[in-house]
Swiss-Prot record:
<keyword id="KW-0067">ATP-binding</keyword>
<keyword id="KW-0963">Cytoplasm</keyword>
<dbReference type="InterPro" id="IPR003593">
    <property type="entry name" value="AAA+_ATPase"/>
</dbReference>
<comment type="function">
    <text>ATPase subunit of a proteasome-like degradation complex; this subunit has chaperone activity. The binding of ATP and its subsequent hydrolysis by HslU are essential for unfolding of protein substrates subsequently hydrolyzed by HslV. HslU recognizes the N-terminal part of its protein substrates and unfolds these before they are guided to HslV for hydrolysis.</text>
</comment>
<feature type="binding site">
    <location>
        <position position="18"/>
    </location>
    <ligand>
        <name>ATP</name>
    </ligand>
</feature>
<feature type="binding site">
    <location>
        <position position="246"/>
    </location>
    <ligand>
        <name>ATP</name>
    </ligand>
</feature>
<dbReference type="Pfam" id="PF07724">
    <property type="entry name" value="AAA_2"/>
</dbReference>
<dbReference type="GO" id="GO:0009376">
    <property type="term" value="C:HslUV protease complex"/>
</dbReference>
<feature type="binding site">
    <location>
        <position position="311"/>
    </location>
    <ligand>
        <name>ATP</name>
    </ligand>
</feature>
<dbReference type="GO" id="GO:0051603">
    <property type="term" value="P:proteolysis involved in protein catabolic process"/>
</dbReference>
<comment type="subunit">
    <text>A double ring-shaped homohexamer of HslV is capped on each side by a ring-shaped HslU homohexamer. The assembly of the HslU/HslV complex is dependent on binding of ATP.</text>
</comment>
<dbReference type="InterPro" id="IPR050052">
    <property type="entry name" value="ATP-dep_Clp_protease_ClpX"/>
</dbReference>
<protein>
    <recommendedName>
        <fullName>ATP-dependent protease ATPase subunit HslU</fullName>
    </recommendedName>
</protein>
<dbReference type="GO" id="GO:0043335">
    <property type="term" value="P:protein unfolding"/>
</dbReference>
<comment type="similarity">
    <text>Belongs to the ClpX chaperone family. HslU subfamily.</text>
</comment>
<dbReference type="GO" id="GO:0016887">
    <property type="term" value="F:ATP hydrolysis activity"/>
</dbReference>
<dbReference type="GO" id="GO:0008233">
    <property type="term" value="F:peptidase activity"/>
</dbReference>
């Protein structure tokens, strides 16, 4: 759990997301409240519930990115889902309880990876011993083993093919799992038979280099207690979990709509207990959702936030509106963020020994075209920059291997040459950009 202050959290988010100050402050306070709750006495701690957030704003303005970066900062189990994937219980499709099961699965993987790091040194030694045994033989003398150990550390054995026994992770009874039911809280037939067939190994040929990760993971897992991994992951989900529900506006039954809105309101009703706090059965054990932070988001172009069920509105007390991005924002996105597209394209072309330099007027031209196409065709926010950049670099990307050693300057003239005609024709840009 992070102990960053709200100001520090916003500062970290500013490195990747331009603007949207109100949304950043809301999620920063929500995350800090997690830390504050941890400092309380036990009896009061259970009474303090997270204030769930509803983000309202057009597509491509940073709603998902804010949540994803927040989860990384928090080092918390995080899951992003689309509300449209789910149906009311009783209809064909996924029910909302699978959100928590997926979150637990993600937490188990995350926790196991973190715990593997803690035993990495011991696992590396055990993996090394297995490789040396495979190369030198089980009965090799200590002197021979040490000679091969030296070669292994120097990388001289990387291309040597060895034959080792590795765990067989396949489950021959997987077909017995009912379709879509593999995540239920009950143990299914496939799992029962899988356990009966568990512990099997299979002999495989591979190079020493290829065996490294496989043996490291196997040896690390031998040093880990599965029950501790499970308990730690469940605790992390219950206390620090973050669920981002996108496209919540798509499950609104609009007030002016008539007819059978199959399971739209039903999905909202099913979400109510999940967000309010309930216990969900998973194959790792029951999970209480009382203290999981839910962030819902939607564009609300057609539906309005007031079209959500009143009870659901009450469970999303913090509302933040994200504004549409302007041309100035696009300039800043291309030049100020740590993961700017300009830096990405520079690095990609550098792999082909082609140097790229972006001028200020070149960046301004890219931003101007993206903003113009958003205005004239469809506003998809910062995602338009991907399309524009890809089109500008299409020719260079194709011929880059033949242009090794060249320096290319991306200025306004270069952008105009590669994109000008397309941007000017609204009919063309509708289909191409």
């Amino acid at each position: 759990m992070t102990d960053l202050t709200p100001r520090e959290i916003v500062s970290e988010l500013d490195r990747f997301i331009i603007g949207q100050k109100e949304a950043k402050r809301a999620v920063a306070v929500a995350l800090r409240n997690r830390w504050r709750r941890k400092q309380l006495a036990d009896d009061l701690r259970d009474e303090v519930y997270p204030k769930n957030i509803l983000m309202i704003g057009p597509t491509g303005v940073g709603k998902t990115e804010i949540s994803r970066r927040l989860a990384r900062l928090a080092k918390a189990p995080f899951l992003k889902v689309e509300a449209t994937k789910f149906t009311e219980v009783g209809y064909v499709g996924r029910d909302v309880d699978s959100i928590i099961r997926d979150l637990v699965d993600a937490a188990i993987v995350e926790t196991r990876a973190r715990m593997r790091e803690d035993v990495k040194a011991r696992a590396a030694k055990a993996a090394e011993d297995r490789v040396i045994e495979a190369v030198a033989g089980r009965d090799a003398r200590e002197q021979t083993r040490e000679m091969f150990r030296g070669k292994l550390k120097r990388g001289e054995l990387d291309s040597t093919v060895i034959e080792i026994d590795v765990a067989d992770t396949s489950n021959p009874m997987q077909m017995l799992d009912p379709t879509g039911q593999g995540q239920m809280g009950m143990m299914n037939l496939g799992e029962i038979f899988g356990k009966a067939f568990g512990g099997r190994t299979q002999r495989r040929k591979m190079t020493v280099a290829e065996s490294h990760d496989i043996l490291m993971n196997e040896e690390a897992d031998k040093l880990l207690d599965d029950e501790v991994v499970k308990a730690t992951a469940l605790e992390a989900v219950q206390q620090n979990g973050i669920v981002f529900i996108d496209e919540i506006d798509k499950v609104c039954a609009r007030s002016d709509m008539r007819g059978a809105d199959v399971s739209r309101e039903g999905v909202q009703r099913d979400l109510l207990p999940l967000i309010e706090g309930t216990t969900v059965s998973t194959k790792y054990g029951p999970v209480k959702t009382d203290h999981i932070l839910f962030i819902a988001s939607g564009a609300f172009h057609i539906a309005k936030p007031s079209d959500l069920l009143p009870e659901l509105q009450g469970r999303l007390p913090i509302r933040v509106e994200l504004r549409a991005l302007t041309e100035e924002d696009f300039v800043r996105i291309l030049s100020e963020t740590d993961n700017a597209l300009t830096l990405q394209y520079k690095a990609l072309m550098q792999t082909e020994k082609v140097g790229i330099t972006f001028t200020e007027d070149g960046i301004a031209a890219l931003a101007s075209i993206a903003a113009e196409v958003n205005r004239s065709v469809e506003n998809i926010g910062a995602r338009r920059l991907y399309t524009v950049m890809e089109r500008v670099f299409e020719e260079l990307s194709f011929h880059a291997p033949d242009r090794s050693g060249e320096e290319v300057t991306v200025d306004a003239a270069y952008v105009e040459k590669n994109l000008g005609e397309l941007a000017r024709s609204s009919d063309l840009s509708r289909y191409v950009l």
